[in-house]
Amino acid sequence: MKGLVQFLVAKIILLVLASTFVHCYDPNPLQDYCVATNGTNRVFVNGKFCKDPKLVTANDFFYSGLNIPGNTSNRLGASVTDVDVRRIPGLNTLGIAIARLDFAPGGQLPPHIHPRASQIILVLKGQLSVGFVSSNDYNYTLFSKILYPGDVFAFPIGLVQFHANTGKTHAVAIGVVGSQDPGVIPIGDAVFGSNPLIDPKLLAKAFALDVNIVRHVQRVFSSEGYIVK
């Protein structure tokens, strides 16, 4: 009996020690709030300077405008209105952000990655084809669904994902991410529109393409910015 108790105690201690090494992508707040400020005379924490708590107002936690449709008159036929720490400074250290996604018929957010956050989306209007691809550990498996109003889909952190309007009307969705600043890496923009450009000969070999095709694609991606506001 004594040996069993010692074993259980040792196991609990190991679990507690292991939990201290768990890494959070957005650290937990160390105070009630830590509103972002561009000032340089404050203590630097969690990636942003903190505003003097005595100067914080309700507006630091407020944004108005997600009811306004985004402009989908672009090459992709889509628009993302991000509401992250840059628009709501009170999100600093809270580990969340939200966005409105608008899609014209046939519009899409092409394959991209959020390097610092998992994501969940809720379709409000229209029809969306969404999905993500697993890593090489799981043989690049595609997980995809057709979503309709009221449907929800989750995307793991750091995996390639996409969203496309496969319906005949405009589509609208709300996306929530687990970071105040999740970042976005559109695969096409990063590979073919980097600054400076990657040597087209390297990309031609990597993607088994003619080098002239690579140069053409680079011209397309380097001349147009991504549609995230």
Curated annotation (Swiss-Prot):
Residue ranges constituting the Cupin type-1 domain according to the UniProt record: 64-215
Indicate where this protein resides in the cell.
Answer: Secreted, Extracellular space, Apoplast
Instruction: List the residue(s) that the UniProt entry marks as the site Probable non-functional manganese-binding site.
Output: Q119
Pfam families (UniProt xref)? Cupin_1
Per the UniProt entry, the signal peptide is: 1-24
Disulfide bond entries: C34-C50
Q: Tell me which SUPFAM superfamilies the record gives.
A: RmlC-like cupins
Q: Which GO terms describe its cellular component?
A: apoplast
Q: Which residues bind Mn(2+)?
A: H112, H114, H163
For this UniProt record, the keywords arranged alphabetically read as follows: Apoplast, Disulfide bond, Glycoprotein, Manganese, Metal-binding, Secreted, Signal
Q: Which residues are glycosylated?
A: N38, N71, N139
Instruction: Note the InterPro entries from the entry.
Output: Cupin_1 (IPR006045), Germin (IPR001929), RmlC-like_jellyroll (IPR014710), RmlC_Cupin_sf (IPR011051)
Q: Which GO terms describe its molecular function?
A: manganese ion binding
Show the PANTHER family listed in the entry: GERMIN-LIKE PROTEIN SUBFAMILY 3 MEMBER 3
Q: Spell out the subunit comment.
A: Oligomer (believed to be a pentamer but probably hexamer).
Which protein family is it in?
Belongs to the germin family.
Q: What does this protein do?
A: May play a role in plant defense. Probably has no oxalate oxidase activity even if the active site is conserved.
> What is the protein named?
Putative germin-like protein subfamily 1 member 2
Q: Which organism is it from?
A: Arabidopsis thaliana (Mouse-ear cress)
